[in-house]
Amino acid sequence: MTLQDYLRDPCGMLSIPYWKAQTVQMPPHIRIVHHRDYDAAAWADWNDEPYFRLMHDLCSIAPAEGPFVCRVAAEAELPLIRELINRSYTDLAVSMKQLQGYRTTPAFAADLWLIALDAQSGEPVGCGIADIDPVAGEGALEWIQVLPEHRRRGAGRFIVNSLLNRMAGRAAFATVSGQVNNITNPEGLYRRCGFTGSDVWHILKKR
């Protein structure tokens, strides 16, 4: 696939950002199929996890508001980023090696690694990681986490809008992906922040 093909319909052409598709080697036990081509009967022997993929044109971005502040995470704060991510999930975990690897990619942007804090207490409430592909002009939200005890206060929207505002003028558009059936409803958060689209990709793993 050429870059020009991808840019005509980013979320409909690939399930991941363009730069990743150029470097990631798909394991043989995994298949990725767009919903338009998906036939449940044909994949009956595979476990299916659907993922939405949405896009933001970065033209109209709400200000980052709420009882929070954010700061750029320093290299020395990678253990804190790891803790915030892992405490936000019950079904996955990231390692220091993974986080360090993210910071060596061609899309790495140091100022898009944010830690969100309660404005009064200074306590970390979550974090956000995004990147920008300078070739495709694509910004991508990679990790958006809010600790369980701080949810339902607007921290997720604060983090997303903080990242989008930092991308404006540097990327032509932004994308994000997440589990369709996640009980925390990440899709709802992203749509409230201005993301649009209807693309769904099925991540299929051989049983």
Q: Model features per residue range: what roles?
A:
Residues 1-66, 202-206:
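Acyl-donor-binding surface of acyltransferase catalytic domains
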Residues 9-10, 14-19, 144-152, 180:
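A short, internal acetyl-CoA/4′-phosphopantetheine-binding micro-motif in the GNAT/acyltransferase core
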Residues 9-28, 158-174, 196:
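Conserved acyl-CoA
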Residues 69-81:
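A short beta-loop-alpha structural element at the N-terminal edge
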Residues 91-146:
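A conserved beta-strand-loop-helix scaffold within acyl/acetyltransferase catalytic domains
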Residues 141, 174-178:
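Conserved hydrophobic beta-strand within the GNAT/NAT acetyltransferase core sheet
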